[in-house]
Amino acid sequence: MSKDEYLITDAPLKALTVFAMPMILGSFFQQVYNMADSIIVGQFVGSSALAAVGACAALTNVFICIALGAGVGAGVLVSRYFGARDYSKMKTIVSTSLISFLILSILLGVFGFCFSHSMMRLLQTPADILEAAVLYLRVYFVGFPFLFMYNILSTMFTSIGESKIPLGLLIFSSVLNIFMDLWMVAGLGLGVFGAALATLIAQGISGVLSLLIFFSRMRRYKSHFAWFDGRELRSMLRIAVPSVLQQSTVSIGMMIVQAVVNPFGTQALAGYSATMRVENVFSLIFVSIGNAVSPYVSQNFGAKKIERIKKGYHAALVLDLCFAVFAFIVIETLHTQISSLFLGKDGTTLAYEVSGGYMRWLGYFFIFMGIKMATDGVLRGLGIMRPFLIANMVNLAIRLSVALIFAPRFGITFVWLAVPAGWLANFLISYAALRKSWPAEKDKPPRERGL
């Protein structure tokens, strides 16, 4: 038995914990890097440059979601064939996905480069930072194939149980990016262009390293394979397309929520933004557990170990409960101190009220997010994508509708009141679909289980 197969052999709780921890650490490290990157640009170039880079964030997040969603489709099938020890089909999926998504990333990169100016104008970017934002975005799109490759291969690594390698590559990429930022922005004085170029170089090196390391891992599995298989591509797309739609739609939805918050003024926005950062940090834990569940489920599904899937799901719920209790205790006892980290002494009473109210409300209900993510992870792992997409769209619809309809009339509180309701509705729909589909479909071949 290969040591890579611990997801189908070790105790479910142990396997998921060992598998998920590098993913959680990697996500936290990414957050630390993002803050460091912003600090460097803001300190050495100025607030206008920081605003220009920040103005690109919403748009780049949509394209990142496309890369992540595409990786999900390939990752689920790689996990399944790995669990079944069908290495020929596994390597065919790897080759087919890399060829297909490389072509897609080049097309998207060319599109983004050519239409950067139009997209930033559509987002109503302020005129004084428009040119700097367009410059940053164009350099970003030049490196988009490397970003795509890195994200696809990170998913591939986790699909075969190798979650530590993406963590190492992420740490390397982040540290390299920070040093390149300092050199190009602070040392060479290249401004926004330097920040974008530093990101391009770091992602390029990480993407190539990912490819080389992954190919070396694939040599362990001796088997013949096809370089490209149209049927397997269709199977991937049945899983990838709902994931892309779900992730990109959520990013767009959060842009709309931001537009609802803006009219409440700078201090309300500051309080909301502070808690959004806290929400993002705690969310990383539950998202990482859900992402760990998918390859665990898919590998065991491929190995026909259905009972282990149930035990793994229950283990994920236990992990979610533990982290939800931890989050509640931290927020309930330290919410004022946490708010002050972002708001400082200049924060007004309104800013602290908004931040504290939103944060404590989330603390009560993070368990809903946890069980939603775990259940969604099982659905993805089994390839049951239609109810997964519906559940996530209902979640987003609840959050958006309450914010758009009630917040302008009755206050900013309604922006976050619906958040746990959306999580709970998402969980109930996903869980109902899981109970309905599991007994009838558990032995069907992968390509029958998409949209």
What are these regions (language model features)?
Residues 62-65, 177-181, 206-211, 281-284, ...:
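Hydrophobic transmembrane alpha-helices of multi-pass small-molecule transporters
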Residues 1-20, 78-143, 187-241, 297-364, ...:
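Short alpha-helical transmembrane segments in multi-pass integral membrane proteins
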